[in-house]
Curated annotation (Swiss-Prot):
Listed PROSITE patterns: INTERFERON_A_B_D
Subcellular location: Secreted
Disulphide connectivity of cysteines: C24-C122, C52-C162
Listed Pfam families: Interferon (PF00143)
GO biological process: adaptive immune response; B cell activation involved in immune response; cellular response to virus; defense response to virus; humoral immune response; natural killer cell activation involved in immune response; response to exogenous dsRNA; response to virus
Organism of this sequence: Homo sapiens
The protein's role, per its UniProt record: Produced by macrophages, IFN-alpha have antiviral activities. Interferon stimulates the production of two enzymes: a protein kinase and an oligoadenylate synthetase.
Gene name per UniProt: IFNA4
Protein name as annotated: Interferon alpha-4
Length: 189
């Protein structure tokens, strides 16, 4: 067991170093993954959103954190990473597993996981290039609070199918904002 864990860690470190040494072209690699995630999320819809209009909720998406004009690239990547991490966490719960068709949920989670790996490699590279703090704490906190509100909503609604549908639509909206941030980053390069 200890040997296999050590081997796994060695492979992970080597692959991480090779990813980082290739350079970070986040806007191209990440935006394709983001589009695939959006398509999968759209396919996951099980019920008509019209039947859930009474359950709509304003989660207070932190749009200003995805403006992109005030960020250096490393900070913007850190915000994107936090959003994808929180989305991954939300859809990795047991309650989420019961709400969605399993194969689509697995594909969606795999796509998010790949994006996290890409973003982590880019964060490491960009911090080294720009020598800026790893992340903008206020922005990261705003994203975390946003996801806390989503989780609280699901809990209050007892993870009902309509609650999950509202959350699915909200996550699609937030992923769209991240796509727009990526476009702005591409223009800055």
């Amino acid at each position: 067991m200890a040997l296999s864990f050590s081997l796994l860690m060695a492979v992970l470190v080597l692959s991480y170093k090779s990813i980082c040494s290739l350079g970070c072209d986040l806007p191209q690699t990440h935006s394709l993954g983001n589009r695939r995630a959006l398509i999968l999320l759209a396919q996951m819809g099980r019920i008509s959103h019209f039947s859930c209009l009474k359950d709509r909720h304003d989660f207070g998406f932190p749009e200003e954190e995805f403006d992109g004009h005030q960020f250096q690239k490393a900070q913007a990547i850190s915000v994107l990473h936090e959003m994808i991490q929180q989305t991954f966490n939300l859809f990795s719960t047991e309650d989420s597993s019961a709400a969605w068709e399993q194969s689509l949920l697995e594909k969606f989670s795999t796509e998010l996981y790949q994006q996290l790996n890409d973003l982590e490699a880019c964060v490491i590279q960009e911090v080294g290039v720009e020598e800026t703090p790893l992340m903008n704490e206020d922005s990261i906190l705003a994203v975390r609070k946003y996801f806390q509100r989503i989780t609280l909503y699901l809990t209050e609604k007892k993870y009902s199918p309509c609650a999950w549908e509202v959350v699915r639509a909200e996550i699609m909206r937030s992923l769209s904002f991240s796509t727009n941030l990526q476009k702005r980053l591409r223009r800055k390069d």
